[in-house]
């Protein structure tokens, strides 16, 4: 997330340009076009950077670009790569880029809280390049926000990570890959721009926040704990010191960094003392 490639955001110039890219993408998809990961990322690459690579931290489309790189290097679609290399070996049978018809009765809606009417509403709009609300195979397989899963499946992935990339005696990720995913890589200057509340006291690895200063963070935790919050409130963290994995899921727009997830974590740690 130090590349300067950003998500759509109307609060700064590079984000506004990216908003134009995604808005055109939505329009074309609504007209029936199927725009691939490669095509969307090539369009995004023509947008200006928010800053020079490495200058600071800012959440963006890095994971989507990584998905395209995996396709190029493996010669497989991103979905097929993840399925064969991770999901099938881990037994993650409910994780995919869409929900098949036979499982739609288990699929939650995405909700938005209406402050004026004090109630939840189903989200009526697209976000982060996702469309169709996961009910059909997408042409754009988003590495940053494209997967549908369950708490059980997510826990299987987190368990593999906390055991150093090994699942049931079989190594799925190299030791170096696990280190890249679970070790802070930010410089002192970059860390200054990691200013989200849920990332206080943290650095950043490859797609995970990493706790470096427990006294500064919200709640409790040990140095080296890592994890992430999804946009809709999917939360996981691994504590390699106490060997704890926490999974918490809600389906609400802006649910990341939610108060309940931190309270749950605090209660669990207090119970283990």
Describe each PLM feature range:
Residues 236-237, 243-252:
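Short, well-ordered beta-strand elements
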Residues 251-273:
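Generic C-terminus detector
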Residues 200-201, 238-240:
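Extracellular/periplasmic catalytic domains that process cell-envelope and extracellular macromolecules
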Residues 69, 237-238:
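Hydrophobic beta-strand positions
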Residues 206, 224, 234-236:
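Residue-level detector of beta-strand structural context in well-folded domains
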Residues 1-220:
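Short, surface-exposed loop or secondary-structure junction motifs
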Residues 230-232:
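Short, small/polar residue-rich loop motifs at catalytic or cofactor-binding pockets
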Residues 220-226:
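Short, hydrophobic/aromatic-rich segments at coil-to-beta transitions
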């Amino acid at each position: 997330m130090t590349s300067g490639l950003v998500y759509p955001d109307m609060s700064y110039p590079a984000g506004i340009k990216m908003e134009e890219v995604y808005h055109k993408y939505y329009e074309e998809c609504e007209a029936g076009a199927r725009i691939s990961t490669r095509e969307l990322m090539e369009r995004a690459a023509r947008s200006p950077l928010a800053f020079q690579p490495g200058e600071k931290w800012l959440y963006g489309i890095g994971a989507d670009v990584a998905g395209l790189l995996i396709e190029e290097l493996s010669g497989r679609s991103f979905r097929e790569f993840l399925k064969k290399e991770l999901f099938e070996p881990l037994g993650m049978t409910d994780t995919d880029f869409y929900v098949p018809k036979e499982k739609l009765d288990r699929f939650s809606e995405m909700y938005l809280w209406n402050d004026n009417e004090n109630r939840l509403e189903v989200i009526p709009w697209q976000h982060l390049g996702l469309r169709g609300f996961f009910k059909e195979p997408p042409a754009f397989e988003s590495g940053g926000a494209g997967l549908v899963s369950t708490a059980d499946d997510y826990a299987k992935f987190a368990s593999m990570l906390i055991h150093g990339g090994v699942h049931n005696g079989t190594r799925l990720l190299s030791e170096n890959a696990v280190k890249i995913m679970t070790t802070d890589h930010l410089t002192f200057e970059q860390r200054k721009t990691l200013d989200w509340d849920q990332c206080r006291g943290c650095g950043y690895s490859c797609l995970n926040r990493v706790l470096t200063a427990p006294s500064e963070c919200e709640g409790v935790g040990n140095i080296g704990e890592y994890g992430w919050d999804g946009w809709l409130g999917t939360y996981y963290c691994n504590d390699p010191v106490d060997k704890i994995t926490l999974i918490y899921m809600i389906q609400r727009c802006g649910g990341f960094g939610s108060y309940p997830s931190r309270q749950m974590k605090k209660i669990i740690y207090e119970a283990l003392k």
